[in-house]
């Protein structure tokens, strides 16, 4: 409701709707914190909506990192997860299904009411949220507020999800027979093959919860989003991808990598938690001589592939830092951990401060699953990559790294010891690797320019703040 003549508009109240699984909520919280700081002069307040378990994890992470307390104008608001109270242990896919069913059945509307109550009755003026939670679009409309979704993955993957119906009509049931066919008839996707598409677009179980979710999201975004935040920066996406997205989503606002939004002295890169001594170990290694290995918190190679990877790292002769869940250590070759520790040639840890590790001058190669957050952290650190994708959008990301941007290599299928050794050797010391390293430095410079004073990502984030707060 517009204010009466002579009355001032109430300050903005932004509801931030999280997808409470994997790293999604943490990424959205980093944006919310930056938004809260930027919007404070307008008197804006933010309500961050997520489930009890998600908020508990975020609080734990915040307390473990210096400077990560919530701004005074940002509050947590707990929302139901949709799971029956009697069920103590629910598999994650089922948790996602229950959460989305609750969201679609009017849950988001109730969450916005909870945000209003937590804000002392201040109505929600804008709904920002993870694009995965597409039912927020209708809830925002019912509240008379715009919906501004945040996309956390690559632009090419978003384009594929939006064009899913057209891709399915084109490929039909022939995906297995057309895996190497380039998608030349689909604007923005000509650099990718059928095999590179995310799971559930033209192959896999279309009814799996995540595949259903992103399909509905892709249908919803073009008709309902007031603007869409993109996790990219000018100069990264090829012009055909940018043009194709702009035609479908005219109000795209790119200001990624999102982890760079917070000021340096406010981020954990200033004094990162490093309980396993990764940075001290790196300080004893040669410049650009270390291979850093991490597949994130979800993806993990099969036991035989883990052993091949370990053997390949040893065979490369390069020092390595490997972040690997401790429950997988028993799968490594006999004596591998002892040899690495005894010679000082390798360090295996259950967790590493990845951003700080990639920025360390001793790291010269990154062996990764090609999750988008990891790709952007590598790009912003100028580190070339060897990608072993597993699922989701990781195949598209790996294709981008190796064939679109040219600052790394991609394994086609499982890693072998010989393949790992060759990839690490090439990235660190090879002739082709030199070109990849140079390309990585070019992209790193583009990121630095975009986030520098007057840079395009800084300008775009200011525009995002204006869109969110003017409602």
UniProtKB/Swiss-Prot annotation:
Catalytic activity: an anthocyanidin + UDP-alpha-D-glucose + H(+) = an anthocyanidin 3-O-beta-D-glucoside + UDP
Residues that bind an anthocyanidin: 24, 161, 392
Pathways per UniProt: Pigment biosynthesis; anthocyanin biosynthesis
EC numbers, comma separated: 2.4.1.115
InterPro entries in the cross-refs: UDP-glycosyltransf_plant (IPR050481), UDP_glucos_trans (IPR002213), UDP_glycos_trans_CS (IPR035595)
Enzyme active site: 24, 130
Ranges in coiled-coil conformation: none
Molecular function GO terms recorded: anthocyanidin 3-O-glucosyltransferase activity
Similarity annotation: Belongs to the UDP-glycosyltransferase family.
Protein name stated in the entry: Anthocyanidin 3-O-glucosyltransferase
Annotated gene: BZ1
């Amino acid at each position: 409701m517009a204010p009466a003549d002579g009355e001032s508009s109430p300050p903005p109240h932004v509801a931030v709707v999280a997808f409470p699984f994997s790293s999604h909520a943490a990424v959205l919280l980093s944006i919310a914190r930056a938004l809260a700081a930027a919007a404070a002069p307008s008197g804006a307040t933010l309500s961050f909506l997520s489930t009890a378990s998600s908020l508990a994890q975020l609080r734990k992470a915040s307390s473990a990192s210096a400077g990560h307390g919530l701004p005074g104008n940002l509050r947590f608001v707990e929302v139901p997860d949709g799971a029956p109270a009697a069920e103590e242990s629910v598999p994650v896919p089922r948790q996602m299904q229950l959460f989305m069913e609750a969201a679609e059945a009017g849950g988001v509307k109730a969450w916005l009411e909870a945000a209003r109550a937590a804000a002392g009755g201040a109505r929600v003026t804008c709904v920002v949220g993870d694009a995965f939670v597409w039912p927020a679009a209708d809830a925002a409309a019912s509240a008379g507020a715009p919906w501004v979704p945040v996309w956390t993955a690559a632009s090419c993957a978003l384009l594929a999800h939006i064009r899913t119906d057209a891709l399915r009509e084109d490929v039909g049931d022939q995906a297995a027979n057309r895996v190497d066919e380039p998608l030349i008839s689909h604007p923005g996707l000509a650099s990718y093959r059928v095999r590179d598409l995310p799971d559930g677009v033209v192959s896999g179980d279309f009814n799996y919860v995540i595949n259903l979710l992103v399909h509905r999201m892709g249908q919803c975004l073009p008709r309902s989003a007031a603007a869409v935040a993109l996790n990219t920066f000018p100069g990264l996406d090829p012009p055909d991808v940018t043009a194709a997205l702009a035609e479908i989503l005219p109000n795209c606002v790119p200001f990624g990598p999102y982890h760079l939004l917070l000021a340096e002295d406010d981020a954990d890169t200033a004094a990162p938690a490093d309980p396993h001594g990764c940075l001290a170990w790196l300080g004893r290694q040669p410049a650009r001589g270390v291979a850093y290995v991490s597949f994130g918190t979800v993806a993990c190679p099969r036991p035989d592939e883990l052993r091949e990877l370990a053997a390949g790292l040893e065979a490369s002769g390069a020092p390595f830092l490997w972040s690997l869940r401790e429950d997988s250590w028993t799968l490594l070759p006999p004596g591998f951990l002892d040899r690495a520790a005894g010679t000082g040639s390798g360090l295996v840890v259950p967790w590493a401060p990845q951003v700080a590790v990639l920025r360390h001058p001793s790291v010269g190669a990154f062996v990764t699953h090609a999750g988008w957050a990891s790709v952007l952290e590598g790009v912003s650190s100028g580190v070339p990559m060897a990608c072993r994708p597993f699922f989701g959008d990781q195949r598209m990301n790996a294709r981008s790294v190796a064939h679109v941007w040219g600052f790394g290599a991609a394994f086609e299928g499982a890693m072998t010891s010989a393949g790992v050794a060759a990839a690490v050797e090439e990235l660190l010391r090879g002739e082709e690797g030199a070109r990849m390293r140079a390309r990585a430095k070019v992209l790193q410079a583009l990121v630095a320019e975009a986030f520098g004073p007057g840079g395009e990502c800084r300008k775009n984030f200011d525009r995002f703040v204006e869109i969110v707060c003017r409602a």
